[in-house]
Amino acid sequence: MKRAEILEAARVCVCGEREQDYGTPENNFETIGLLWGVYLRAAHPELARVMAVNHITAKDVAAMMGLLKVARIATGNKADSFVDLAGYVACAGEIATAED
């Protein structure tokens, strides 16, 4: 896949079908962050005492989902992992710049 094709495929996903299926990235990632936080505090109460992170933000979720894709890329070269990574990075950038 050429870089323009990867970016276009990511644009189609994050600006079309994914948003229609799951809502805006900001809202969806905020919900994911809340659920991850609840899970981590319940599953690992010792972390809650030593970590200052009380809230996983939408930007955090987008960044960590990007890292998940990086881990997948490290073990294979599926085109959709690169497309998804581009999409998560774009969402993280949009969320971060909207916060400023």
Residue ranges and their predicted role:
Residues 1-100:
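Intrinsically disordered, low-complexity regulatory regions
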